UniProtKB/Swiss-Prot annotation:
CC annotations in GO: mismatch repair complex
HAMAP family: DNA_mis_repair
Protein name: DNA mismatch repair protein MutL
Domain of life from the UniProt record: Bacteria
PANTHER family: DNA MISMATCH REPAIR PROTEIN MLH, PMS, MUTL, DNA MISMATCH REPAIR PROTEIN MLH1
GO molecular-function terms, A-Z: ATP binding; ATP hydrolysis activity; ATP-dependent DNA damage sensor activity; mismatched DNA binding
Record keyword DNA repair present: yes
UniProt entry keywords in alphabetical sequence: DNA damage, DNA repair
Length: 597
């Protein structure tokens, strides 16, 4: 077959395959055009998952009659003044969106420029243009796309259900709305109630309002502002505290120069920053905005412009990690306050037993000769409560007054051998002793590793731990990494490991249990996992085994010592798994519980 030039309509349909992948791609391109046109309000409507109809209306600058005629030609754009593709400051710039959409759908554009006496309209159907005609429109541009992919029926077979495509459209609009809180957005159609996001004030407060409207009240309540800047690169936005996580990474919204992107470099930086706070199967919720010179980033990597390439990727990654870690460390106490708020919101007053309730039928009624049946109690019947009489003499251990002024207060008691209750000047704090000590041990291990290494204790008699051969090989292969944390192991035959030294920080530990947990975690590691991340996983596992367990009775001085250690430990508001280590209730919170406020 001889080589021949393809017709323009076929060329446009081929190009449309790169730009218009699904209805959500159409919405993205058209909304970006509206943003570039300076719109302050954008209305989006879709029907049938975008297959039947998509309508985008804005109040932007609009187009003149001459511009409208060129807008549907390939590679015609108003967004590039010269040949320098490295100085792109607009979201769309290729000049392919409108002709590509018109090549595979029925496209109608109605627009009015401020300098025109009236609006103009133009139709494109399967690549064939209709003449431009006068129309009625007060301001801006209205683009209607009907029967998407009617000209390429094979593409319809690859679309998902209407519901799935509608959700993809919703996700695109949400991301664009997050990037521009100064623009009002309305999303309607799909037999749903319209959703409107009003324009917010500029700056971080307005940005947080928009993010809260889209991501929910939980994100707004847990949001931590992050900011970092160096060498012309700025990172800002909001990150949720470790108390708010998800089972996947879909809650991570990333923007580069106002453009929503899905960048592996940024996602990896987010994971690294949260590695000390979350378990491996949980993901943070963040909205990060990276701003840098246009020359420092290539947005022309993919036709859909969802991928970017940084000139100095290392600097961008380091800034993101630094901004997130600094924000998380600064707001370490937020988790406790937020947890207390959730406790209050779900609290329901206890129901009192009926007046004729027989307490002897209660499971808590002592059986046999208990202290309550002793003569000393029987001979002295209980007196009625005397309002004017003195209070009961409840003796507790003495607490130094200055301890009440410490951030975590003075320990008062331990309940269920698991939780420490401490008193502060304006409330009380409940501490999970295991979670708190786990964070303390973890931070100590990290500090020791960064200094001169973790101190070891030699076992007089090595612990021999029996395991299957594959597990033994896995542990022995990582023996050098384990030794950095003071855990010295070696093979002891085909099915056993000898533990010769353990970290001093862990004290007396169950070596068999620790090794089995380490082996399970190592089995899940990707070979490409950086050494630093592997070491932090080892430290987290050791900290869990080396911390005080629930069920251990603590003396008052031990409880206070733990509180003081928490105050001196970074990130002590959460354990290594992202759970809160303590909950703080102010007097105001307590009064709300009892209906005093």
């Amino acid at each position: 077959m001889p080589v021949r030039q393809l017709p323009e309509t076929i060329v446009n349909r081929i190009a449309a395959g790169e730009v218009v992948e699904r209805p959500a791609s159409v919405v993205k391109e058209l909304v970006e055009n509206a943003i570039d046109a300076g719109a302050s309000r954008i209305d989006i409507f879709s029907d049938g998952g975008g297959r039947r109809k998509i309508v985008i209306a804005d109040d932007g600058s609009g187009m003149t009659r001459a511009d409208l005629a060129l807008a549907v030609d390939r590679h015609a754009t108003s967004k590039l003044d010269d040949e320098d593709l490295l100085q792109i400051r607009t979201l769309g710039f290729r000049g392919e969106a409108l002709p590509s959409i018109g090549a595979v759908a029925r496209l109608t554009i109605t627009t009015r420029h401020a300098g025109e006496p009236h609006a103009w309209t133009l139709g494109v159907e399967g690549g064939d243009k209709s003449p431009i005609a006068p129309a009625a429109l007060s301001q801006g541009t209205r683009v209607e796309v009907a029967d998407l992919f009617f000209a390429t029926p094979a593409r319809l077979k690859f679309l998902k259900t209407d519901r799935t495509e509608a959700e993809a459209i919703r996700d695109v609009v949400r991301r664009l709305a997050m990037a521009r809180p100064d623009i009002a957005f309305t999303l309607a159609g799909e037999e749903r109630a319209p959703v409107t996001w009003a324009a917010a004030l500029p700056g971080a407060p307005g940005q947080l309002i928009r993010l809260g409207d889209i991501l929910g009240a939980d994100f707004r309540a847990n949001a931590i502002e992050v900011r970092s800047e160096r060498e012309g690169v700025a990172v800002e936005g909001f990150a949720a505290s470790p108390a708010l996580t998800r089972a996947n990474a879909l809650g991570q919204y990333l923007f580069v120069n106002g453009r929503p992107v899905r960048d592996k470099l940024i996602l990896g930086a987010v994971r690294a920053a949260y590695s000390d706070y979350l378990p491996r199967d949980r993901h943070p919720v963040v909205a990060l905005f990276v701003t840098l010179e246009s020359r420092e980033v290539d947005a022309n990597v993919h036709p859909a412009k969802t991928e970017v390439r940084f000139r100095n990727a290392g600097l961008v990654r380091a800034l993101i990690v630094h901004a997130l870690k600094e924000g998380l460390a600064r707001e370490g106490r937020r988790t406790a306050a937020n947890s207390a708020g959730s406790v209050i919101s779900t609290f329901r007053p206890a129901s009192m037993p009926a007046a004729n309730w027989d307490w002897r039928a209660s499971p808590s009624y002592p059986v046999g000769g208990s202290a309550i049946d002793a003569p000393s109690f029987a001979e002295r019947p209980q007196a009625a409560f005397d309002v004017g009489g003195p209070s009961a003499d409840i003796r507790t251990h003495e607490v130094a007054p200055d301890l009440l002024d410490r951030p975590l207060g003075a320990a008062r008691t331990q309940i269920h051998e698991t939780y420490i209750v401490s008193q502060t000047r304006d409330g009380l704090i409940v501490v999970d002793q295991h979670a708190a000590h786990e964070r303390i041990v973890y931070e100590r291990l990290k500090a020791s590793l960064a200094a001169n290494g973790v101190q070891r204790q030699i076992l007089l008699i090595p612990d021999i731990v029996e395991m299957d051969e594959a597990t033994v090989e896995r542990l022995v292969a990582r023996a050098d990494e384990l030794a950095q944390f003071g855990l010295v192991v070696e093979s002891f035959g085909p099915g056993a490991v000898a533990v010769r030294e353990t970290p001093s920080l862990l004290g007396k530990t169950d070596a068999a249990s620790l090794l089995r947990d380490l082996a399970e975690h190592m089995a899940e590691w990707d070979e490409a996992l950086p050494l630093e991340r592997r070491l932090m996983h080892v430290a987290a596992t050791m900290a869990c085994h080396g911390s005080v367990r629930a069920g251990r009775v603590l003396k008052p001085e031990e409880m206070n010592a733990l509180l003081r250690e928490m105050e001196a430990t970074p990130n002590s508001g959460q354990c290594n798994h992202g759970r809160p280590t303590y909950v703080e209730l102010t007097l105001t919170d307590i009064e709300k519980l009892f209906g005093r406020r």
